[in-house]
Amino acid sequence: DDAVANGVHAISGVVDS
């Protein structure tokens, strides 16, 4: 999954806390 600056994975849609 590609993690974006906002912490959201663009592909899986999982949020990184």
Curated annotation (Swiss-Prot):
| Gene Ontology CC terms, in alphabetical order | extracellular region
Q: Which UniProt keywords apply?
A: Secreted
Main localization of the protein described in the UniProt heading: secreted
Compartments where found: Secreted
Name the organs or tissues of expression: Expressed in skin glands.
Belongs to which family?
Answer: Belongs to the Frog skin active peptide (FSAP) family. Septenin subfamily.
Reported function? May act as an antimicrobial peptide.
- What is the designated name of this protein? Septenin 1g
Look up and give the organism this protein is from. Answer: Osteopilus septentrionalis
